[in-house]
Amino acid sequence: MNAPQENQASQDDADVLIIGAGPVGLTLANTLGMAGVRVIVAEKLPRIIDYPRAIGIDDESLRTLQAAGLSDQVQAHITPHHWMRFYTASGQCFASIEPRTDEYGWSRRNAFIQPQVDDILYRGLQRFDQVQVLLGHELHSFSQDDAGITATLKDADGVERTLRAKYLVASDGGNSLVRRMLNVAFEGRTKPNQWIVVDVRNDPLGTPHIDMHCDPQRPYVSAALPHGIRRFEFMVMPGETEEQLSRPENLAQLMRKVVADPDKVDYIRKRVYTHNARLAAQFRVDRILLAGDAAHIMPVWQGQGYNSGMRDASNLAWKLAMVVKGEARSDLLDSYEQERRDHARSMIHLSEVAGDIFAPESHTAAKVRDTVMLALNAVPPVKQYFAEMRFKPMPRYEQGVVLHHTGTGNQGVRTPFAGLLDRSGNTPLGRLLGLMAEKKESLVGRLVHGLETAASSPVGRMFIQPRVATANGHSGLLDDFVGLNFCILAWGTDPSYGMDEEALNFWQRLGARFIRAMPAGQLLHPTPTRDGVLTVGDEQGRLKDWFSAQGKSVVFVRPDRFVAALASPQEVSAVTRQMARVLHSPLEA
């Protein structure tokens, strides 16, 4: 069987050209670098941006940085378990988001200072001889053909440089030149109000979390950040301008809402931001792919702009690596848009809902919000639902590189207050919510839609990351034993035992890891396995609990840690053939 076309020799300067050295471009370059892919990153600025933007990084993003081999360095610049609390104008807390679980190996909510993490990503590229960064080089033009893309860059002196690559990834921000030159629509809206953001040193408050003060007179945010930094954000009210609020006397007046003496505050910088909610109509145009803010932008209220971009990088990296190495046909890249676009839309909706709750458009709406939220907060299951951040739409891929028909067949798990949300007409509240939820673009519609029953099958969802141990005494998080590879993991049995030669050769050719999990105590007397199979002990009992909830004992995990399929030990060869099909990868070398 002939190898896919992308495996043919060429005179390309790189396999992948990345436009934009923000967090998405740098993360993608690091991950591709670890996979041995030749990468050029072009950034129009002379240096990576050094002013803070995002302040929240979630467990999924930290897991991505772990996969890139940089999590140890990043931990020095994060505050884990960073809760978010919402207060009425009178100072009464009406909601608290404080998830305390770590199913993916990391705290679910974390504060960080983005430039410090961006610098780690930038310096991380020095590990790879085949990765090059061109700072001060702006994209001037590009074209594509059946074999690749040709791009012309200009440096600060106007000197042009032409590059050839197999694929181009545009991570060049919300004002993406690539997206505009492709004439890809960027649908959505821009909020009319702006926010002035003030960062200060030597935290004048010292409280450890993020407080959202929902005062309709002027909503504001107070967020504790690592290294004694604090961020304040104040809404720019109608009739005010950035120039007015930036004057020392007016800024001091704003700061008196939060500190006793503004003159004693150690200011770092202040900037004004406008909140946008937009989604690209396409994430892929042949050999060009959009990622991060070039593909989607959203309000900051749940910190998901940065994290959505990191999800893009994680999803796209392993697929690009397979394609440029000739392990899969280019059709695999269609799954990037299939898997990421709908979830990006969901995160935009969540961010808009959070913004509507935080800063409603009228005093009357604020009073209704306070009354409703305080009432809901008095119901323990509802309070727990928000505290554990279960309202956050977790990625679940319905199509793409997933095999849903091999799942457990379970029909779903109901939310703690699913009865309240029953739209069948069995309760008055259910009938009311049902009517309001018909308009999913409304506040209530989006909220109800996000709280409804979710399917329980793990296929298409991120796999857990517990701590495991090996017989030789090594202990750590599961991903550290897998690397940037596929993983076939089984509970209590050798996952390769039931595989025929063709299936086994397929996974070995892709570098997949075979792992057998068992109770940690059984590591003292493990039964034999086939060569190359790693046996790990389930130190926390979480793998046992996970498999107990499934009807199958073998899980196929993708390099981005999402569950691709479930199987019984006797189905692994058949499932492998199905996996080869959805991966657009030949079974035979």
Swiss-Prot record:
What reaction gets catalysed by this protein?
3-(3-hydroxyphenyl)propanoate + NADH + O2 + H(+) = 3-(2,3-dihydroxyphenyl)propanoate + NAD(+) + H2O; (2E)-3-(3-hydroxyphenyl)prop-2-enoate + NADH + O2 + H(+) = (2E)-3-(2,3-dihydroxyphenyl)prop-2-enoate + NAD(+) + H2O
Molecular function terms from GO: 3-(3-hydroxyphenyl)propionate hydroxylase activity; FAD binding
Kindly indicate whether the keyword Oxidoreductase belongs to this entry. Answer: yes
Q: Which cofactor does it need?
A: FAD
Where is the signal peptide, in residue numbers?
Answer: none
The answer to whether UniProt assigns keyword Oxidoreductase to this entry is yes
Q: Name one GO biological process term.
A: 3-phenylpropionate catabolic process
Residue pairs linked by disulfide bridges in the UniProt entry: none
Q: In which pathway does it act?
A: Aromatic compound metabolism; 3-phenylpropanoate degradation
- Matching InterPro entries: 3-HPP/3HCI_hydroxylase (IPR023786), FAD-bd (IPR002938), FAD/NAD-bd_sf (IPR036188), PheA/TfdB_FAD_monoxygenase (IPR050631)
Q: Which residues bind FAD?
A: 15-44, 283-293
Sorted UniProt keywords: Aromatic hydrocarbons catabolism, FAD, Flavoprotein, NAD, Oxidoreductase
E.C. number: 1.14.13.127
What HAMAP family would the database entry show? MhpA
**Free-text function comment from the UniProt entry:** Catalyzes the insertion of one atom of molecular oxygen into position 2 of the phenyl ring of 3-(3-hydroxyphenyl)propionate (3-HPP) and hydroxycinnamic acid (3HCI).
* Family (UniProt): Belongs to the PheA/TfdB FAD monooxygenase family.
PANTHER family, per database record: 3-(3-HYDROXY-PHENYL)PROPIONATE/3-HYDROXYCINNAMIC ACID HYDROXYLASE, FAD-BINDING MONOOXYGENASE
Q: What is this protein called?
A: 3-(3-hydroxy-phenyl)propionate/3-hydroxycinnamic acid hydroxylase
The gene is mhpA
